[in-house]
A protein has these predicted regions:
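Membrane-interfacial amphipathic/re-entrant helices at transmembrane-helix boundaries
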Residues: 1-19, 31, 45, 54-66
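Hydrophobic core segments of alpha-helical transmembrane domains in multi-pass membrane transport
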Residues: 18-19, 43-47, 104-108, 149-161, ...
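Short, non-helical or kinked segments that cap or interrupt transmembrane helices
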Residues: 24-45, 64, 86-99, 171, ...
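Alpha-helical transmembrane segments within multi-pass membrane transporters and channels
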Residues: 57-106
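Transmembrane helix-bundle core of multi-pass membrane transporters
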Residues: 103-165, 266-278, 303-313
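Helix-loop-helix "hairpin" substructures at the membrane interface of multi-pass membrane proteins
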Residues: 141-220, 244, 248
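Cytosolic-side transmembrane-helix boundaries in multi-pass membrane proteins
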Residues: 159, 177-191, 263-313
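Transmembrane alpha-helical segments in multi-pass inner-membrane proteins
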Residues: 219-284
Length: 313
């Protein structure tokens, strides 16, 4: 049971962070389908930071440097979406799909180049970060507490305050609802949309780091992030683009994802003799069912996915 709770919380943390990132982007009016690719690049930045930053670095400094690296890499990668969708009015869904493909491919190429430079016989896409990973973890009895679990709670609260209680958040939401009206009162729609995309990249990149620290002490980047970017989109829609609802939805999806990892520890589930692949499919099946039922009632930002034309009224 302890393991189920532990995995549920860490997977929910990943989904909540990435879904919050998507929420900021879509509230600004830009659909971010590329969360999967952003997660991979953020994970790459964090993994390389854990690999190359000296182990003698003080724990809190190491923690901050690793997090900042993931956040910055995610933000830089998200600029591809920002420039293409905001500046050149490209189709946002196509750009996001391209980012997903490019993220994993670029990560594999970079990691293999580094590994070959260190050892010509090592052509794997694996980064090992065994020692540095411990800076995120605290043992509480049998429970392995990850500091990101606390960070996510703070992120949910901060997101709610920023989006609905600050001038910046209200302006951001205005650009996703009626950009022409926002522009008419002096709000720079382009700047707000870039801000939304950059925040999305920061949270998506951080989510990628949390994902790889939830597993073993190395990561093979050919595996990507197992569709968590797409699950986060389902969490965002299920949460109706609201921070607190997204946190609750992430717990639900995180539970089913965790169940696929630890179901062998529950005798009643083992007695059912269901194939392991069914448990692995559970979170994705749930996402399809949820989206099928709520798609007609979802209240997405009205101008999301629509390129802003300053001359249109």
């Amino acid at each position: 049971m302890t393991l189920l709770v532990q995995y549920t919380l860490i997977f929910a943390s990943v989904l909540a962070l990435v879904a919050l990132g998507g929420c900021f982007s879509e509230h600004s009016g830009v659909i971010n389908i590329g969360l999967e690719g952003i997660m991979v690049m953020g994970a790459l930045g964090g993994a390389l930071a854990m690999k190359f930053i000296p182990a003698s670095t003080p724990g809190i400094v190491l923690f901050i440097l690793i997090v900042l690296t993931s956040v910055l890499v995610g933000m830089v990668f998200s600029l591809f979406l920002g420039v293409a969708a905001i500046h050149f009015n490209a189709d946002q869904t196509l750009v996001g799909t391209a980012l997903n493909l490019m993220g994993t491919a670029a990560a594999v190429v970079i990691v293999r180049a580094i590994n070959v430079a260190e050892n010509p016989d090592n052509v794997s896409s694996t980064v090992v970060y065994r020692q540095a990973k411990q800076v995120f973890l605290v043992k509480i009895g049998d429970f392995e507490f990850n500091w990101f679990m606390l960070l996510v709670v703070l992120a949910i609260i901060a997101s709610h305050v920023v989006l609905y209680k600050t001038k910046f958040g209200l302006r951001l939401c205005a650009c996703g609802e009626h950009p022409q009206a926002a522009d008419s009162v002096g709000i720079s729609v382009y700047k707000m949309r870039y801000a939304g995309v950059l925040i999305s990249g920061a949270l998506g990149g951080l989510g990628g780091l949390v994902y790889i620290t939830a597993g073993v002490s190395e990561w093979k980047f050919e595996n990507g992030v197992a569709g968590f970017g797409f699950l986060a989109l389902a969490v965002m829609i299920f949460g109706q683009w609201r921070s607190v609802n997204i946190g609750l939805a992430a717990l639900l999806f995180g539970f089913f994802r965790a169940l696929s990892n630890v179901y062998t520890g529950f005798a009643p589930l083992v007695a059912l003799k269901l194939p392991s692949s069914l448990y692995n499919m559970l979170p994705y099946i749930i996402s399809l069912i949820v989206l099928a039922f709520i798609s007609q009632k979802s209240r997405a930002p009205k101008a999301e996915g629509i390129p802003y034309d300053k001359g249109q009224r």
